[in-house]
Amino acid sequence: MGWNELVSRAESRWMEGTGPHADIVLSSRIRLARNLDDLPFPQRMSEPDTERLLQAAEAGVREINLVGFPSRVELYRLADTTPLDRQILVEKHLISPQQSKEVMAKAVAISEDEAISIMVNEEDHLRIQVLASGLQLQEAWRVASQVDDALEQRLQFAFDEQLGYLTACPTNVGTGLRASVMMHLPALVLTQQAGRLFHNLSQLGLVVRGLYGEGTEAAGQIFQISNQTSLGKAEEEIIANLEAIARTVIDTEEQARRHLYGEMRLQIEDRVSRAYGILTTARMISSEEAMRLLSDVRLGVALGVVPKIDYRILNELLVAMQPACLQRQAGRELNPLERDVRRAALIRARLSA
């Protein structure tokens, strides 16, 4: 897969909407932070150090492809890309907002199905990420562990017998693992239970963030729930703990949905129908309004209020309607009004398909 194909399509494997509990869990993610033992952390690297890191990453990717993953991995140096294209990767959750800036010595390796991505020279030397559809933390971990093992065949990671893997941020020291689930929780928000739930999650050592992770706000009632520290626990324990909590959150959201629909059936049907009506007829729409209305429609699909729409379409729209993706499809820079017009046209077309 070439770079142009990568940034021209809004589809990724995690958007398929076929995983367990896809009505609530958009995706599961496993991220591993790794650093080479013979280089300083990224914040202290010299220019020769960064070139050595990029060359090491290229060698590591070659090793990954020798393992025989179903989807080939390609490495791209970000200095050779445009800001617009890098923003598309942010919108597709393949790189972080931080990785898209100051790119002279940075790279990213991405598999053809976009399930695997490896950020090079972000906060750590390597950030291995695996995304899976629905609640599939164990499957994402299986793939991430295989990628990690393949890299260790070629690279020597910084590791301490007592502390574990050494990372730039102390909260990642240990396993270097961050497990997360992206969840749609409209009923908990509408019944005003979300605040209490998030407080309880923080007491359990979890953190709740917005759609694009740290420093971002929740949009479309979509939240990212992840572990906060990785020291002193095995990878399997961290993942099992998050999965158990995710299942509890799913049960709580489902109960809230049943309560809402049982007590306020007419109001919910009106809210969902209005959202569907606007999205299928509007001639211009902002990203904020679209996110809010798509959240209502997604809830309506789960409750059977609106015609059955594939979750894949709803997931892909979350990305395809973002500013960078819209401009890439247009082949030119768009002003805000032009983006709103193209966004509305895109949503009308996809929902009526």
From Swiss-Prot:
A molecular-function term among this protein's GO annotations: ATP binding
InterPro entries recorded: Arg_Kinase (IPR023660), ATP-guanido_PTrfase (IPR000749), ATP-guanido_PTrfase_AS (IPR022415), ATP-guanido_PTrfase_cat (IPR022414), Gln_synth/guanido_kin_cat_dom (IPR014746)
Keywords: Allosteric enzyme, ATP-binding, Kinase, Nucleotide-binding, Transferase
A Gene Ontology term for the protein's cellular component: extracellular space
Chain ranges for the short sequence motif RDXXRA motif of the pArg binding pocket involved in allosteric regulation as given in the UniProt record: 339-344
Reaction it catalyzes: L-arginyl-[protein] + ATP = N(omega)-phospho-L-arginyl-[protein] + ADP + H(+)
Entry annotated with the keyword Nucleotide-binding: yes
Transferase listed as a keyword: yes
The protein's enzyme class: transferase
EC number assigned by the record: 2.7.14.1
Annotated ranges, domain Phosphagen kinase C-terminal: 24-256
GO biological processes: phosphocreatine biosynthetic process
Chain residues that bind ATP: 27-31, 93, 127, 178-182, 209-214
Regulation of protein activity: Appears to be allosterically activated by the binding of pArg-containing polypeptides to the pArg-binding pocket localized in the C-terminal domain of McsB.
Free-text function comment from the UniProt entry: Catalyzes the specific phosphorylation of arginine residues in proteins.
Family membership noted in the UniProt record: Belongs to the ATP:guanido phosphotransferase family.
Family matches, as NCBIfam families: PRK01059.1-4 (NF002194)
Name of this chain's protein: Protein-arginine kinase
Organism for this UniProt entry: Symbiobacterium thermophilum (strain DSM 24528 / JCM 14929 / IAM 14863 / T)
